């Protein structure tokens, strides 16, 4: 018989840097999950990613207090800021541009995000990511 699911917890945790401090500790503690066990497993799974890259994770907590988790790809906005070499997006994206991304960079981000995005094809994903870039005040070349 399958285990009974008690809760789903969605968090964004820095890759390779999960620790019991907030937001991880309180979110897992209220469901009775072993926090250090999660931190060790998460850090081991994300060691191949760039350290500190915000990584969405969905944790499934079962009634016997065991858990499983699935890591997602980093948010498109984070990948776009990294590609453009900017610290943050523009406060006024229509008038104030803060950086530039090329079509090749958008293609690379779309391929990275392909596993998580529900787009029909790579072109649709590229358009979605280009739209995100424009809404952040980035100029899309190509």
From Swiss-Prot:
A single BP term in Gene Ontology: translation
Top-level taxon: Bacteria
Protein name in the entry: Large ribosomal subunit protein uL11
Sequence similarity: Belongs to the universal ribosomal protein uL11 family.
UniProt keyword NADP, yes or no: no
Gene name for this UniProt entry: rplK
SUPFAM superfamilies associated with the record: Ribosomal L11/L12e N-terminal domain (SSF54747), Ribosomal protein L11, C-terminal domain (SSF46906)
Listed HAMAP family: Ribosomal_uL11
Post-translational modifications: One or more lysine residues are methylated.
Organism: Vibrio parahaemolyticus serotype O3:K6 (strain RIMD 2210633)
Function per UniProt: Forms part of the ribosomal stalk which helps the ribosome interact with GTP-bound translation factors.
GO cellular component terms, semicolon-separated: cytosolic large ribosomal subunit
GO function term, MF aspect, one: structural constituent of ribosome
Keywords in alphabetical order: Methylation, Ribonucleoprotein, Ribosomal protein, RNA-binding, rRNA-binding
Subunit structure, interactors included: Part of the ribosomal stalk of the 50S ribosomal subunit. Interacts with L10 and the large rRNA to form the base of the stalk. L10 forms an elongated spine to which L12 dimers bind in a sequential fashion forming a multimeric L10(L12)X complex.
Signal peptide: none
